[in-house]
Amino acid sequence: MSAKDERAREILKGFKLNWMNLRDAETGKILWQGTEDLSVPGVEHEARVPKKILKCKAVSRELNFSSAEQMEKFRLEQKVYFKGQCLEEWFFEFGFVIPNSTNTWQSLIEAAPESQMMPASVLTGNVIIETKFFDDDLLVSTSRVRLFYV
């Protein structure tokens, strides 16, 4: 095992996504929240989010995570897949993570134009969000969450 692989394993071992919520960015109202560690690789997670989230012009995502390890440049790359085809890609950067810290990270996700939005009935169960967790260029974990619109 290379030093990079070992480092990625150490970071992942000490990393936990404690909770996450999604809010309507305009009103601040929480639309969905969960405490499952959606960063765990190797399993397909599921999230049931309200259909009305699709009507929001922007969604504010708040992540609370703990890390035993220091990270120089913690960042996420996310891809939204519909029936296996990538529809959207997002990039988020948190930056430096203090070792043995718990952090809350808020990000704004702008919606696709309404003309490009598919109805919840078509999307539900067919959308997977793949999240890659990085420390700079070092891939730490890849997780997948299947979305159901309720």
Curated annotation (Swiss-Prot):
UniProt source species: Canis lupus familiaris
Keywords carried by this UniProt record: Cell projection, cGMP, Cytoplasm, Cytoplasmic vesicle, Cytoskeleton, Membrane, Sensory transduction, Vision
Residue numbers spanned by region Required for association with membranes? 144-150
Q: What GO cellular component entries does it have?
A: cell projection; cytoplasm; cytoplasmic vesicle; cytoplasmic vesicle membrane; cytoskeleton; cytosol
Q: How does it assemble?
A: Interacts with the prenylated catalytic subunits of PDE6, an oligomer composed of two catalytic chains (PDE6A and PDE6B) and two inhibitory chains (gamma); has no effect on enzyme activity but promotes the release of the prenylated enzyme from cell membrane. Interacts with prenylated GRK1 and GRK7. Interacts with prenylated INPP5E. Interacts with prenylated Ras family members, including HRAS, KRAS, NRAS, RAP2A, RAP2C and RHEB. Interacts with RAB13 (prenylated form); dissociates RAB13 from membranes.
Q: Which Pfam families match?
A: GMP_PDE_delta
Report what the protein is called.
Answer: Retinal rod rhodopsin-sensitive cGMP 3',5'-cyclic phosphodiesterase subunit delta
Sorted alphabetically, the Gene Ontology BP terms of this entry are: visual perception
